Amino acid sequence: MKTAIVGLMMFGTLLCAEGESTDIRMPDIVLDAIKHCECLIESGECNPNVIRINADEEAQRAAAAGFAVSGHLIKCGSSEQCSMQAQALIDGGITNLDLGPYQINYKYHPNPMLHEYFEDTSAREQANAILTKLVKSFGYSWETLGRYHHFSATDRTRNERYYRKMYAFIYGNNTNSQGSN
C-alpha cells in the first residue's frame, strides 16, 4: 500500500513537472547575469523601478499622455509608483513594456500582480520561469540565454551581443558589459 501511494505521488509530481515552468532551477549566476544585463545601473547600483516602453510610437504616445518618458524609459520612485504607472499604460493600450530589474515583458509574460515585476524575489522567480521555458524549447546554450532579452531568432547579432554580456559577467570580464541593448 505504501509503495502504491509513493508511486502515485511520484507519478503526480512528474505530471505536474511537465507543465510547470519552475521544475528546472537556473543557476543563480545565470539569473544574476540576466539582472546585470537588464537592470538600469545608476550610481553603480541596480534601479529596479524602471519601465521600458519598447515601441517608438507607444513611447511617444505615453509622453503625449503626460508620462515622464525619457527616450523609452520611465523611472519611478518606488515599486508602488511603477505598478500604478504600468497599470495606467496598460489601461491605455500600451502593453509592450519591460518591467523591473529583470525587464520582464508584460505583453508576453502578463501578470496581474504588477508589483511583482518590481520586487526582486518575485521578478527573479519569473525570470527563472521564462529561462526554463526557453531552455525546454531550445536547449541549454548561450544562444538560448540570449533569447531572454530578444526572443526573435531572426536577429541573431542582437542575441549574440546580449549573451556575450552575460558570458563576460559570469566569467569576470564585465568592464563593458553593463546595461541592456
Predicted regions and their residues:
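Catalytic glycan-binding domains that act on GlcNAc-containing polysaccharides
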Residues: 18-181
